[in-house]
């Protein structure tokens, strides 16, 4: 294009260089090239050939330059169009990418919105769960606070009961230190016993009846008859038999009349008797009649109770346990193996189960002298030494009694004797029935109740049992070594039957600080059995005291 433009310029220059020659020859100069379209034909005819050629060359050069410019412009436009098209393509690509990004962002927004909705739902559920959990926790905390308050109330009751037990223990220590062994305490009220004096046949009191003396056993009961016959003292056996009256023989534990009365009573009254005697029954137990206090028999001297009950002297326990007969063991609720273990001393495995103490502990509680060990060994082996010694002690106790003392025994004390023997028969019968019944009421306890008119009901079961022991130990504690084997430790504090090996648990040495607990247990069992036998059979109450017995029905 530049070459064409150069050629056109050269042609134009050549035309100009040639034009002055004819111009000088012509009259009128030629018009410019631009004016050719305006020049008329007549004027063109007047021009010369050179002028026409120059005008034509000029017009052609102009046209060529215009065409070149136009082509240049077209090329420039095309180039610009190409650039614009490239930009458009790039923008299209960018737009496509942006659209893809926009779609991705939309999808992401939808996903995030779904997550937000899910988060809202989860937050609502979490708040609902939190409110429900807070309510449940509030209820649980309130329940546990109530339980905690109940436990605190129970703990306060236990603390009060423990304080009462401590006061009772202090009272027991004071009473033991004061030496209250002289006041005799009976199972029934003294008024009932005084009214029984006229109805009881007057005969010499048996020293070994087990009521309140420190003798070694009831010589008038059939099981002790066999015991003395086997121990080689027939003289002592015949003496109380000849002294007994027909009424006395009717009240004996081996008579066929009395055991039929308790059988008619049945066992449903027995749980009531487990609650212990009533407060009216407790009142006369702690008071001895003036006649009893003025005429204490040899077995109720102040030396007897500390030696044989409180001090844990096991001489009477060992003699009585070691010389037990088969009938005695059978009434106590044992099999032949039970009898053999019970008669020969056995092992020390019983009292730890019934009371929770170890054999060494009980061995320390009941420490005996060498005479006690010797007497227990001879009685356990079936020799005649223990029985002869028992017979000698009983004969001395009967021969040393003055006529006035015998009259006292023939009156009030004989009623206690017959009453205790009938209670023994009842206890034997209950033990025979207990062996055939399931022991479902072993852990039955009386819940503590409050009553301003009755101090006993405000205490716990343990405090009531200790109170029952204390009210019964002053009248029954001195006769504990003389009671049959069915009374002593035949059931634990929880009602479980004792092992036949408990006889051997009374050997050993005891310190004064370790003595009271097994003695408390023994006297408590005796007291519960006596109250059980008296309360569960109204026939004994009607027959003896004329419906004046104040024990539990």
From Swiss-Prot:
The modification Asymmetric dimethylarginine is found at residue 541. One of its GO terms (cellular component) is adherens junction. InterPro entries: CCDC85. Keywords: Cell junction, Coiled coil, Methylation. Residues 236-260, 391-403 have a biased composition (Basic and acidic residues). The keyword Transferase does not apply. It comes from the Eukaryota. Residues 1-37, 203-414, 433-461, 491-518 are annotated as: Disordered. Belongs to the CCDC85 family. This is Coiled-coil domain-containing protein 85A. It comes from Homo sapiens.
